[in-house]
């Protein structure tokens, strides 16, 4: 806070000049900071610290800059938020100029990311909630893309920037520090790696379709309740390299074809092949009729059983909640995977299908799995009856009943045969070469050709897809590096020098002057330092993870020792009781013998 105050004089003058600019109409109120009562820090945004506060007897969120380098992002967010007014975009109440801060609507439900992957207890949510969140997100982004005279592109769509209110039923987009006006040429790399469109970090020109790619990743994330590309691990540029090579999140078993087609179209390598946000809104609005109950508040579990504590929270409602009780037996027969030796989608062996069908029918009603920050390969084995994602086969049947789309054939999936719901081109899953293992841990990425199919032989319930693209195509970059610069075949440090994109705003290198060798040299040095920084941070994270594992093992050992000690004491106590009972038994036996002898004497005398 003190840093923000120190920077307020210069920041307020720039903000004041921007406010007074006659060419811009900004709809916000200049607020006196004395009217604000700060309560607590709740997080960080694209810039600055976000605090909960009271202003005019209502809860608000204030965002303050911490350094001079964040002033530009502050002005961007102030300018963009002052232009928008939509129920699915966080409302700007006003701004303070001394110290510099934004006063915005407070979201009591926190971010969607925390709802999906936060600390326990995690809330239950249904398929209707997941679809509603994505619909509301698309409505907000479609509004940004359709603004006049200049449309807006968010460029940083991800669950941490999606806030929930009204019991988790209403979603609001926030964090416009990276937003910009839609232009013909935009090469500034903004956003986060897991949700970032490939054309953004490749340095080529990109458009509003980069938001569509991010939305498609979010759709996958809320359905599976798993972090995208989490199985890759390591620094963020590993994700970038995998996405650049065509890797996408694994398809979801039993996902209705219209939803799967929409999702995979959003992941297309070619931005022109992705649907517009307006089209997404129309499709999602149509599909929402099959998902009632989105207006019910999220429910948090009061307590967990032993199993619940080990497996984290799950969703009470899934796509299977709308289906009949025998859906799991029926749906598992349609499970598909991509073999490691070719690109044809085949059925699993009948024995595996029968076993999984039996196990899943015994497991009862399954639901959205909770995130544990784990990869696809860390899912529970099939013998536990757990699925990676929700069962949506009955919803698919309902959609089929009303739209009468043709049944998909075996082999390559026909993603465009959905009647009148989706009039889209066919998504081609290509691949002529043999996929090979790379050194990136827990991930099978594509080979040297971007169009090859990537598969995960140890995950029969999912199939990894890649989008096709010209194999000779090389991305245009805004700096002198290209993927061909890499001499490391292990996909490590030199694979893709874009690590600085995921650093905090104040740590990212400034764009160099292409005509200055010194500027380019400084930029290259800064990027290498950023790469080294990311490597060190990764090592720290791995060491911390190992530390947590050791602490957990130590706790388990202590519990085992306590249990052993308790068992020894119980055994000793039982031995004492046994000895006491034996003594008592002998006494009773002697007394019985005495009584019998006395009775015999009496009978003899009589």
From Swiss-Prot:
Binding site for ATP: 42-50, 63
Glycyl lysine isopeptide (Lys-Gly) (interchain with G-Cter in ubiquitin) crosslink residues: 72, 158, 209
A Pfam family matched in the record: PK_Tyr_Ser-Thr
Modified residues (Phosphoserine): 192, 367, 389, 439, 455
Keyword line: Apoptosis, ATP-binding, Cell membrane, Cytoplasm, Isopeptide bond, Kinase, Magnesium, Membrane, Metal-binding, Nucleotide-binding, Phosphoprotein, Serine/threonine-protein kinase, Stress response, Transcription, Transcription regulation, Transferase, Ubl conjugation
Domain of life per record: Eukaryota
Domain Protein kinase: 36-291
Region (Disordered) residue spans: 301-338, 354-391, 443-493
Gene Ontology CC annotations of this record: ATAC complex; cytosol; plasma membrane
SMART domains xrefs: S_TKc
Regulation: Activated by pro-inflammatory cytokines and in response to physical and chemical stresses, including osmotic stress, oxidative stress, arsenic and ultraviolet light irradiation. Activated by 'Lys-63'-linked polyubiquitination and by autophosphorylation. Association with TAB1/MAP3K7IP1 and TAB2/MAP3K7IP2 promotes activation through autophosphorylation, whereas PPM1B/PP2CB, PP2A and PPP6C dephosphorylation leads to inactivation. Ceramides are also able to activate MAP3K7/TAK1.
CDD domains named in the record: STKc_TAK1
Start-end of Low complexity biased regions: 361-375, 453-463
Cofactor annotation: Mg(2+)
Active site (catalytic residues): 156
Keyword Cytoplasm (UniProt): yes
InterPro entries in alphabetical order: Kinase-like_dom_sf (IPR011009), MAP3K7 (IPR049637), Prot_kinase_dom (IPR000719), Protein_kinase_ATP_BS (IPR017441), Ser-Thr/Tyr_kinase_cat_dom (IPR001245), Ser/Thr_kinase_AS (IPR008271)
A single GO BP: toll-like receptor 4 signaling pathway
Positions where Phosphothreonine occurs in the chain: 184, 187
Matches recorded under PANTHER family: MITOGEN-ACTIVATED PROTEIN KINASE KINASE KINASE 7
Family: Belongs to the protein kinase superfamily. STE Ser/Thr protein kinase family. MAP kinase kinase kinase subfamily.
Full protein name: Mitogen-activated protein kinase kinase kinase 7
High-level lineage: Eukaryota, Metazoa, Chordata, Craniata, Vertebrata
């Amino acid at each position: 806070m003190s840093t923000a105050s120190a920077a307020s004089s210069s920041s307020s003058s720039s903000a004041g000049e921007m406010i007074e600019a006659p060419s811009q109409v900004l709809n916000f109120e200049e607020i006196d900071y004395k009217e604000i009562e700060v309560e607590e820090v709740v997080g960080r945004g694209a810039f600055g610290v976000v605090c909960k506060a009271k202003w005019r007897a209502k809860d608000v969120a204030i965002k303050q800059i911490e350094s001079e380098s964040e002033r530009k992002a502050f002005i961007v967010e102030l300018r963009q938020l002052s232009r928008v007014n939509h129920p699915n975009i966080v409302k700007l109440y006003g701004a303070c100029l001394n110290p510099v801060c934004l006063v915005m609507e407070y979201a009591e439900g926190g971010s969607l990311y925390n709802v999906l992957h936060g600390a326990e207890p995690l809330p239950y949510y249904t398929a209707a909630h997941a679809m509603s969140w994505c619909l509301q997100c698309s409505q907000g982004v479609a509004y940004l893309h359709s603004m006049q005279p200049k449309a807006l592109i968010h460029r940083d769509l991800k669950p941490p920037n999606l806030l929930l209110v009204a019991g988790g039923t209403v979603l609001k987009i926030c964090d416009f520090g990276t937003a910009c006006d839609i232009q013909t040429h935009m090469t500034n790399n903004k956003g986060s790696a897991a949700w970032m469109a490939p054309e953004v970090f490749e340095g080529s020109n990109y458009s509003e379709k980069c938001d569509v790619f991010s939305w498609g990743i979010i759709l996958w994330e809320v359905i599976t309740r798993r972090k995208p590309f989490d199985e890759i691990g390591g620094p963020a540029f590993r994700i970038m390299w995998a996405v650049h090579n065509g890797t996408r999140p694994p398809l979801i078993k039993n996902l209705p074809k219209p939803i799967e087609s929409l999702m995979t179209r959003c992941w297309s390598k070619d931005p022109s092949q992705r649907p517009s946000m307006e089209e997404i809104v129309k499709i999602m609005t149509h599909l929402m009729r099959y998902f009632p109950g989105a207006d019910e508040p999220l429910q948090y579990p009061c307590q967990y059983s032993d199993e619940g504590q080990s497996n984290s929270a799950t969703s009470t409602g899934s796509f299977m909640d709308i289906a009949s009780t025998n859906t799991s037996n029926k749906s598992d027969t349609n499970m598909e995977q991509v073999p490691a030796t070719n690109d044809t989608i085949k059925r699993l062996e009948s024995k595996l299908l029968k076993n999984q069908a039996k196990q899943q029918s015994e497991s009862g009603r399954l639901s959205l799995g909770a995130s544990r920050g784990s990869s696809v390969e860390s899912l529970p084995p099939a013998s536990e009856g757990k699925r990676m994602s929700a069962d949506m086969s009955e919803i698919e049947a309902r959609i089929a009943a009303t739209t009468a789309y043709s049944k998909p054939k075996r082999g390559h999936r026909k993603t465009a045969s959905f009647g009148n719901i989706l009039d889209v081109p066919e998504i081609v899953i290509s691949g002529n070469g043999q996929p090979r293992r790379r050194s990136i841990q827990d991930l099978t990425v594509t080979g040297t050709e971007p169009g090859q199919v990537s598969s995960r032989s140890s995950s029969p319930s999912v199939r990894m897809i890649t989008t096709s693209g010209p194999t000779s195509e090389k991305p245009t970059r805004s700096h002198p590096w290209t993927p061909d610069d890499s001499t490391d075949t292990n996909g490590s440090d030199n694979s893709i020098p874009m690590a600085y994109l995921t650093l905090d705003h104040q740590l990212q290198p400034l764009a160099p002057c292409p005509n200055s060798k010194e500027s380019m040299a400084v930029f290259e040095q800064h990027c290498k330092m950023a790469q080294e920084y990311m490597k060190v941070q990764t090592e720290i994270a791995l060491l911390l993870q190992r530390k947590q594992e050791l602490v957990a093992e130590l706790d388990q050992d202590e519990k085992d020792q306590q249990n052993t000690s308790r068992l020894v004491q119980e055994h000793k106590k039982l031995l004492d009781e046994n000895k006491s009972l034996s003594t008592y038994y002998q006494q009773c036996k002697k007394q019985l013998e005495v009584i019998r002898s006395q009775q015999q004497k009496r009978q003899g005398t009589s």
